[in-house]
């Protein structure tokens, strides 16, 4: 006769967080083993792309004790948070804003010189 299986924990509903698989133990018994959810990995909040170079783990497994720092991040500004293209875009935007400020300042000085020159 077939061995009956009983859930060992949680509730009996077939939800995503309560998935099981049947495993045969060394003693020959069949038991339910809880399966973990598949990890999708960290995403960039700006572009929505997956961040390269970081393993796909469940959120609790990124903790200090389970994963060393060099495996949690990428070695660049905003490493492990933003994707490379988002960081590049941000750097270029910041540079252009600073350039615009300088241009404004120069134009203001030129205008001031023009106002002073005709009077003399």
Curated annotation (Swiss-Prot):
The lineage of its organism: Eukaryota, Viridiplantae, Streptophyta, Embryophyta, Tracheophyta. GO terms for molecular function: mRNA binding; structural constituent of ribosome. The keyword Ribosomal protein applies. This is Large ribosomal subunit protein eL34z. Keywords: Ribonucleoprotein, Ribosomal protein. The gene is RPL34A. It comes from Arabidopsis thaliana. InterPro entries: Ribosomal_eL34, Ribosomal_eL34_C_sf, Ribosomal_eL34_CS. Belongs to the eukaryotic ribosomal protein eL34 family. The keyword RNA-binding does not apply. One of its GO terms (cellular component) is nucleus. Pfam families: Ribosomal_L34e. Coiled coil: none annotated. It comes from the Eukaryota. PROSITE patterns: RIBOSOMAL_L34E. GO terms for biological process: translation. Residues 31-51 are annotated as: Disordered.
């Amino acid at each position: 006769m077939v061995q009956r299986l009983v859930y060992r924990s949680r509730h009996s509903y077939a939800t995503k967080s309560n998935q099981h698989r049947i495993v045969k133990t060394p003693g020959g018994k069949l038991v339910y083993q809880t399966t973990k959810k598949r990890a999708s990995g960290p995403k960039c909040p700006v572009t929505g792309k997956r961040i390269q170079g970081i393993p796909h783990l469940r959120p609790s497994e990124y903790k200090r004790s389970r994963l060393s720092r060099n495996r949690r991040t990428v070695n660049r500004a905003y490493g492990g948070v933003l994707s490379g293209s988002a960081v590049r875009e941000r750097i270029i935007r910041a540079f252009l804003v600073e350039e615009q400020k300088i241009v404004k300042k120069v134009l203001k000085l030129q205008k001031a010189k023009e106002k002073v020159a005709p009077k003399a």
